[in-house]
From Swiss-Prot:
Record protein name field: Ribonuclease P protein component
Role according to the record: RNaseP catalyzes the removal of the 5'-leader sequence from pre-tRNA to produce the mature 5'-terminus. It can also cleave other RNA substrates such as 4.5S RNA. The protein component plays an auxiliary but essential role in vivo by binding to the 5'-leader sequence and broadening the substrate specificity of the ribozyme.
Catalysed reaction equations from the record: Endonucleolytic cleavage of RNA, removing 5'-extranucleotides from tRNA precursor
PANTHER family xrefs: RIBONUCLEASE P PROTEIN COMPONENT
Alphabetical list of InterPro entries matching this protein: Ribosomal_Su5_D2-typ_SF, Ribsml_uS5_D2-typ_fold_subgr, RNase_P
Chain ranges passing through the membrane: none
Keyword hit for tRNA processing: yes
Biological processes, Gene Ontology terms: tRNA 5'-leader removal
Gene Ontology cellular component list: ribonuclease P complex
Gene3D superfamilies in alphabetical order: 3.30.230.10
Superkingdom assignment: Bacteria
Organism: Ligilactobacillus salivarius (strain UCC118) (Lactobacillus salivarius)
Matches recorded under SUPFAM superfamilies: Ribosomal protein S5 domain 2-like (SSF54211)
The enzyme's E.C. designation: 3.1.26.5
Length: 113
């Protein structure tokens, strides 16, 4: 996923947190903020320190990023997303990460078929 598809700045994260809608399952929390003037979606990924050491957190972020890249054609394009991983994600395989992320994105009504 290219860097132009990422939410990076603290102010942008806070805007999505405060003004966006949230949806969650046991593995992920997703905040979504619609931005009609935006050409493509952007994603911010947050993995807290409760999830292992730095190696484990980076592993989880890579898995989430890869899953989102594979789901890219189905995602709503005019939104900013924040994906927050919960501690159970550290023990999941790539297929499970993608499946649970797909589930929470469907709940948030941002994933088409």
């Amino acid at each position: 996923m290219r860097k132009s598809y990422r939410v990076k700045k603290e102010a942008e994260f806070q805007t999505v947190f405060t003004q966006g809608q949230s949806c969650a399952n046991r593995q992920f929390v997703v905040y979504m903020l619609e931005k009609p003037d935006q050409k493509h979606f952007r994603v911010g990924i947050s993995v807290g320190k409760k999830i292992g050491n730095a190696v484990a957190r980076n592993w989880v972020k890579r898995r989430i990023r890869q899953s989102l890249t594979e789901l890219k054609p189905q995602l709503k394009q005019d939104c900013d997303f924040l994906v927050i991983a919960r501690p159970t994600v550290a023990y999941m395989s790539m297929a499970e990460v993608k499946e649970h992320l797909k589930h929470v994105l469907k709940l948030a009504k941002v994933l088409g078929e």
